[in-house]
């Protein structure tokens, strides 16, 4: 693969020695028992909040921060690339920034400094290799990971990008394939870390950076039965609350407004992608409003729900005409309402609901024939 922006060896070395090492290494002091904090999470998950927590953890002893993204501005071509091709600037400079980060880690370990390694941790084998090396060097190793739903982190990627682009004319973007690869890889890493006793402490956090799971090694065994894999899956896949859906929909409304501004010069593809996500977010919100709020309030927010409510009433009338107990009618209507809500989430409520009266009628006819 061609690397046209890779620096010559002398320039590469000079920048590391005179700028990177000179800036990062003096911020810490050697430790008798050094600690390495490794972060994890797909792009947009909020890993920066974990770095902030680690910085506070090391406020007295200092630390060496290892983060290739933080080193990119040291590359002489990076800012120009950000102005002309901000979505690929990171990849185009990684031939230098990756080795700089690795060397900074090596120098920090040799100096027995506390270390914060800000990364996605999407590769279980790479994490295992890193933790083995750190432990052999006398480090206590912690893994702190964001357990965040893919929908939330995807939205945050766009919000970060648009915010940076609005402020400075360019922004840092993560492509969907990179996001999805990391999303799957981080989960695999968490499970491998706990199964293999790869770290001394493992902490999972929700999207607000609140801890939801913690386990520690004590005398070579986990203090609690391993459950990080299940905890991460549960948090990532739990349904959004009504308030979370409101915030999610509002986020895409704001993004759509940003892209609509003439000075943004958004491409049709960018506008279309956000519009699609905006529609999906609105459908998710409408479905939860349908589930939780009274029809009058729901239709004030989403007038298009009127058809769904009308069809539900028709099904209810049909059900009431059949020889069902009150409990049976309640069970049927609960199932109907949830099916309608699921259809609203998919954006095809009217089409799906219209079929329900026919199914109810068909079941009634079958019972009549059996009598």
Report the location of each language-model feature:
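Hydrophobic positions on the alpha1 helix immediately C-terminal to the Walker A/P-loop
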Residues: 50
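Conserved lysine of the Walker
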Residues: 47
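Conserved nucleotide-sensing/catalytic segment adjacent to the nucleotide-binding pocket
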Residues: 60-66, 70-132, 137
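Small-molecule kinase domains that catalyze NTP-dependent phosphoryl transfer to phosphate-bearing small molecules
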Residues: 171-216, 231-234
């Amino acid at each position: 693969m061609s690397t046209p922006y890779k620096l010559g060896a002398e320039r590469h070395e000079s920048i590391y020695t005179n700028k990177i090492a000179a800036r990062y290494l003096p911020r810490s002091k050697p430790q008798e028992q050094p600690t390495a904090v490794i972060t994890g999470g797909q792009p947009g998950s909020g890993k920066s909040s974990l770095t902030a927590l680690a910085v506070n953890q090391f406020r007295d002893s200092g630390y060496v921060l290892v983060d290739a993204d933080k080193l990119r501005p040291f590359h002489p071509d990076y800012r120009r690339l950000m102005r002309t091709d901000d979505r690929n600037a990171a990849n185009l400079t990684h031939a230098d920034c990756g080795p700089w980060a690795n060397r900074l880690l090596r120098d920090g370990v040799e100096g027995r400094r506390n270390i914060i390694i800000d990364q996605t941790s999407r590769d279980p084998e790479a994490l295992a290799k890193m933790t083995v090396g750190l432990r052999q060097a006398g480090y206590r190793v912690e893994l702190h990971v964001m357990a965040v739903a893919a929908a939330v982190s995807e939205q945050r990627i766009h919000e970060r990008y648009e915010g940076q682009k609005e402020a400075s004319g360019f922004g840092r973007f993560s492509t969907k394939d990179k996001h999805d690869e990391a999303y799957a890889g981080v989960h695999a890493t968490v499970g491998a870390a706990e199964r293999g006793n790869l770290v001394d402490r493992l902490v999972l956090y929700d999207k607000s950076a609140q801890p939801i799971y913690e386990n520690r090694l004590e005398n070579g065994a986990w203090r609690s039965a391993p459950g990080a894999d299940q905890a991460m899956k549960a948090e990532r896949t739990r349904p959004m609350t009504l308030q979370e859906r409101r915030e999610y929909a509002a986020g895409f409304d704001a993004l759509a407004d940003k892209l609509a501004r003439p000075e943004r010069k958004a491409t049709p593809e960018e506008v279309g992608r956000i519009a699609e996500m905006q529609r999906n977010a609105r459908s998710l919100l409408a479905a939860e409003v349908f589930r939780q709020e009274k029809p009058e309030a729901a239709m004030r927010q989403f007038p298009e729900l009127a058809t769904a409510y009308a069809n539900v009433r028709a099904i209810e009338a049909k059900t009431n005409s059949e020889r069902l107990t009150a409990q049976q009618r309640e069970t049927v209507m609960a199932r109907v309402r949830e099916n309608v809500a699921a259809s609203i989430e998919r954006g095809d409520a009217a089409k799906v609901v219209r079929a329900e009266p026919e199914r109810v009628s068909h079941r009634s006819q079958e019972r009549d024939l059996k009598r």
